[in-house]
């Protein structure tokens, strides 16, 4: 999360230099990178919509068309995890630094910590469609390409329904490859793997995205569930919303003249929406 503080900030330079280094939080877990656009958070609850597909009818040209509105289903789930963060910020005058600037610092600090809590999210992610593979002698790149082909085929656009009144469903393509240490080591040996180096724009945006292969962003995690080699997914099948439930700034800190005390709580949660958009691969047993 970044902010244009140079235009909106009215405090002193010393305070600004203390706050700015923390506002560009690094996100580590892939759902944090790919927050669904149709998710809202209110308090400790996340709301999202399951949009239904268009109706498709077939018949002679010029026939009367009936309007059928299927609408969308609104659903919700609780954000049952939270992080609290707080501390003393020295040499910051409460009167000269607005609470939104302090709040942004707290939220971004909490963002970095929340993103490190991969285990809960990965456990939920691993509930996707179970797949097995036999490691190719030609390397991990071939395994990835085969897995992408399976994903795209199973998520291709399909017409469902009866007769001439059908609906189009699907159309999702694989966009992300989540790998653990073992499979990542194999992937690095493939010349098709494009590794991103520190300092590149992509790396700066999300430190967990380590490169690209086969048209997919490669996300590295050290906390892959046991037995899972890699996960091929489209982020639309998974939600990881975050929200701030409270932020407070206190003007006086005992024993620290000229300092303020700030604290905040961030709530978050994980939910698998479509198991078929998350393919979880384990090596086939010999």
Regions found by a protein language model. Give the residues of each.
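Sequence/fold signature of self-assembling virion shell proteins
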Residues: 2-7, 14, 19, 33, ...
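Short, Lys/Arg-rich flexible segments
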Residues: 2-21, 25, 95, 114-118, ...
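Surface-exposed, low-hydrophobicity beta-strand/loop segments enriched in small/polar/acidic residues
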Residues: 23, 30-33, 39-55, 63, ...
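Near-N-terminal "mature-domain entry" segment
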Residues: 63-68, 108, 112
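Alpha-helical scaffold segments that mediate packing/assembly in large oligomeric complexes
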Residues: 89-163, 279-286
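Extended, solvent-exposed, turn-rich assembly/linker loops in the middle of proteins
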Residues: 129-203
